[in-house]
């Protein structure tokens, strides 16, 4: 399990930190990745498909997040403050 050092408590939900991945799926405009928390060494991201949460994951980069968009599994996330 990856551990992430917290940068701050800011949660971005409707911001510029939203990445569209419809070009990588048979997606609608409601498919996107949102960064929930930013850490020094990665991000916690939420994947939505058709407006519903698909899963949440910890990733080191936005590129890694985009590679995982087809993995529809729930994940437990642990944090190191």
Roles of regions detected by a PLM:
Residues 29-30, 63:
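Low-complexity, intrinsically disordered regions enriched in charged/polar residues
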């Amino acid at each position: 399990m990856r551990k992430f050092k917290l940068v701050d408590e800011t949660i971005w939900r409707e911001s510029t930190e939203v990445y569209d991945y419809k070009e990588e799926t048979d997606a609608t405009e409601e498919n996107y990745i949102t960064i929930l928390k930013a850490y020094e060494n990665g991000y916690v991201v939420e994947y939505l498909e058709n407006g519903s949460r698909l899963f949440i994951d910890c990733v080191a980069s936005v590129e890694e997040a985009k590679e995982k968009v087809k993995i529809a599994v729930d994940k437990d996330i642990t944090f190191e403050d």
